[in-house]
Design a protein with these regions (language model features):
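Active-site metal-binding loops of divalent metal-dependent hydrolases
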Residues: 230-234, 258-261, 284, 356-358, ...
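Di-metal (Zn2+ and/or Mg2+/Mn2+) metal-binding site signature of metallo-dependent hydrolases
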Residues: 272-299
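Catalytic core of the metallo-beta-lactamase
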Residues: 338-394
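Metallo-beta-lactamase
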Residues: 138-174, 179, 211-213, 308-362, ...
């Protein structure tokens, strides 16, 4: 049901698609015409589908009604790489068909940020006090250099893209080929004959995984310091993923330019989202920021590390793409601004950032942990010959030139890009480096097949099994305490512990490592400990039947402690697991009299009322992670809905939302009275609750029964902690 401000069904793909079309693996429709193929919908890396399937490159791309798939958190209008491919390789413009004039405006805004970069220079506050002005980049001069193509001059958006607007319901794409906009469907007409009908809204296919999502490799343990390469290639390599990393510091990770669907890739290999608490955004090209935006909308709110200059560009770009305001997008993450020339402190280590030499503002960085260091170049042009030419032409100031002509060869490990010139580092320049540097050098942003085998260079290898470990011989100060505090912060009701209570937990926490198959908790025994999972997966088994699994960041054992009752289920290590245990008396003493204990007691009560099973009946809430479901349950309050009881009135500021159990609730809204809502339905004026504005609808109980209420402040906090869930509920008054 999609009217009256309900969300779209998770798998909606528009009307039945018929005719001469092909559904592309990453999403979108490929329609063959007599003049050449046309593609409707452009998901990230779509050009790789065409290359892998050995299809002709489309002569035109149609942007769908919605440019952004909220369910997947991805663009369906990623025209950057099709435009680059057409311009640089095929030597032609990329035709973009837009269904409304406003869409062209939005696309041009995106192009400004991704192709040419933000206007103006960074503020002085983005650099450390005393950082020499002569070392600061002059982005306007550098950008002009990169956007000037020999033989063509200065590149403009219209040199890459030809816009075709649908007016009066139709548009001619090329002579003889017409697109007709029928509202919820698009018709492709070839010389007067309808050859395909496709949905005007393109929903991306569901994520797939070939690996058991709950089992981690038993032999793999996260390094205290190191890098996992998630992707080592570029946007035109059909066999490789775009370049991105996991930077491990203190046994936890920060993502760097994650490829799309990174969370699922890691979960399938036993690395839970709560193991990752930050993302570094190096710049705003689609092969680096598409997965970043997707990650910001998943599970809990995380930290975003970049400069304010790059952040502003990122927000403008994705506001234009998603149709969401910059202010709303800004609330989906915790921004940690980085300053050039000053360290960012992370779990006892340091990150030092620098602006690289690229077509748009881009950062690279050096990471230090204990007595070891790792350098990650970011996209950059390291080519002494070209850099010298830029200096001689007056594009680079002397101090900036000196920074760019040097190579960071002194680090323990160096991950350096070797992409496609002229924007990237030529392999030949890296081949000139000393042999002892090459031994610590890993090439990224390059297809493995393009790395020469005779000059001592090597491509970085993707996957957690190839993690580059740079273990320090001396850990940073307070490393153990920092790690324990990070573990407590993974638990929602412990995240905001006062310092005095956190100190108490530090004193009594116990670390445990158990092999796969070990019983951690036995059904029927007395509950004497509370457990937090640090690494690995556990299986909850009740009366011999597996009922749920928990991963890193999840916890268990609280019910038996609070109720002082026997354990009601077994908990078995599904993989090797690393746990933190808190004894019953220590746990209760640390939380006694706090809001955290109140929330935990509420969770136990709600679980006994069957709330977990109720969430599984809701199309959106069923897809929450176990950690999200647990957090939501700490805010739910069971209540009884009386006959014709009014839950909220039109014109009033609503105070609660509700999850319906065996009651029946009816909504009356400006569109009329809606069908009754029953078990598993979420009802609540989300926008009014978020803004404390008046409700346009009213709700009442039409059949007596049980409900779960959630107070407005608790709902707001849940949405703030889980921005992707908030986007699923944005603009709704019910979710079934």
């Amino acid at each position: 049901m999609t009217d009256a401000k309900g969300p779209p069904p998770p798998e909606t793909r528009g009307p039945a698609t018929v005719g001469a079309w092909l559904a592309l693996p990453r999403g979108g429709y490929y329609v063959r015409t007599s003049a050449g193929p046309i593609q409707i919908g452009i998901p990230p890396e779509t050009i790789k589908d065409v290359m892998e399937l050995k299809l002709d490159v489309p002569i035109a791309y149609v942007l769908p009604r919605d440019l952004f798939d909220r369910r997947r958190g991805l663009s369906v209008a990623e025209f950057e790489f099709p435009a680059y491919y057409s311009f640089f390789l095929l030597k032609r413009r990329c035709r973009l068909v837009v269904l409304a004039p406003d869409v062209e405006r939005r696309v041009r805004a995106i192009f400004q940020e991704s192709l040419f970069g933000p206007t103006g220079e960074p503020l002085a506050t983005e650099f450390a006090d005393g950082y020499p002005e002569a070392r600061r980049p002059r982005f306007q001069r550098e950008s002009e250099y990169f956007r000037t193509v020999p033989g063509r001059g200065r590149i403009e958006a219209d040199d890459l893209v030809e816009f075709i607007q649908v007016k009066g319901g139709s548009a001619e794409i090329v002579p003889g080929i017409t697109i007709v906009d029928q509202g919820d469907a698009l018709v492709i007409r070839d010389n007067g004959k309808d050859i395909a009908v496709v949905g005007a809204t393109v929903s991306l296919p569901s994520r797939t995984s070939s690996t058991d999502p709950d089992v981690s490799p038993a032999s793999w343990v996260a390094p205290s310091f190191g890098v996992t390469v998630l992707g080592a290639s570029h946007g035109f390599d059909p066999s490789g993923k775009t370049t991105g990393f996991l930077l491990w510091m203190g046994g936890r990770a920060i993502l760097v330019d994650p490829p799309t669907d990174t969370t699922d890739y890691l979960r399938a290999r036993g690395i839970a989202p709560k193991t990752i608490d930050g993302v570094i955004l190096t710049h705003c090209h689609a092969d680096h920021d598409a997965g970043t935006f997707q990650k910001l909308l998943e599970e809990s709110q995380i930290s975003l590390y970049t400069t304010p200059h790059i952040l502003g560009s990122f927000l403008r770009k994705y506001s234009a793409l998603s149709g969401l305001s910059e202010d709303l997008l800004r609330r989906t993450f915790s921004f940690h601004p980085v300053r050039i020339g000053a360290p960012v402190h992370v779990r006892g280590g340091e990150l030092w950032f620098k602006y690289t030499l690229h077509s748009i503002p881009t950062i690279g960085f050096d990471a230090f942990y204990g007595n070891r260091s790792i350098s990650i170049s970011g996209d950059t042009l390291y080519d002494p010959k070209r850099v010298t030419e830029m200096f001689e032409q007056g594009i680079l100031d002397p101090a900036r030139f000196e920074d760019l002509i040097g190579f960071p060869g002194h680090h323990s490990a160096i991950l350096h890009e070797a992409g496609i010139p002229p924007l990237h580092t030529p392999v030949a320049a890296l081949a000139e480096l000393p042999d002892d540097v090459k031994k610590r050098l890993y090439l990224v942003h390059i297809a493995a097949k393009d790395v020469p085998t005779d000059n001592g260079l090597r491509a970085a290898r993707e996957g957690i099994e190839h993690t580059i470990r740079v273990e320090p011989s001396a850990a940073p100060r307070f490393a153990d305490a920092i790690e324990l505090l990070d573990i407590f912060a993974m638990v929602d009701f412990l995240r905001d512990l006062p310092l005095s209570r956190a100190r108490s937990l530090l004193q009594v926490a116990r670390r445990m490592t158990l092999p796969a198959g070990e019983h951690i908790v036995t059904q029927g025994t007395k509950g004497d400990s509370f457990y937090i999972i640090v690494n690995g997966t556990v299986q909850v088994v009740k009366d011999g039947i597996p009922i749920k699994r928990y991963r890193a960041g999840d916890y268990f054992g609280e019910m038996a402690i609070l109720l002082d009752s026997p354990r009601n289920a077994d908990v078995v290590a599904k993989s090797d697991v690393d746990l933190v245990a808190l004894d019953r008396n220590d746990f209760l003493a640390s939380l006694r009299g706090s809001e955290m204990l109140t929330r935990l007691e509420r969770l136990v009560a709600v679980r006994n009322e069957g709330a977990w099973e109720l969430l599984a009946q809701n199309t959106v809430l069923a897809h929450l992670t176990s950690a999200q479901k647990t957090q939501l349950q700490t805010y739910l309050v069971p209540c009884q809905g009386g006959p014709n009881e009014v839950l909220w009135r039109a014109g009033d500021i609503p105070k609660k939302a509700y999850l319906v159990d065996d009651a029946v609730v009816t909504l009356r809204c400006p569109e009329g009275e809606l069908k009754p809502f029953t078990s598993g339905a979420f009802v609540g004026e989300v926008d009014a609750l978020r803004s404390t504005g008046p409700s346009p609808s009213s709700a009442r109980v039409t059949q007596t029964g049980k409900l779960f209420s959630i107070d407005r402040p608790d709902l707001v906090r849940f949405f703030e902690d889980n921005p992707g869930v908030y986007l699923s509920f944005l603009g709704t008054r019910f979710v079934e």
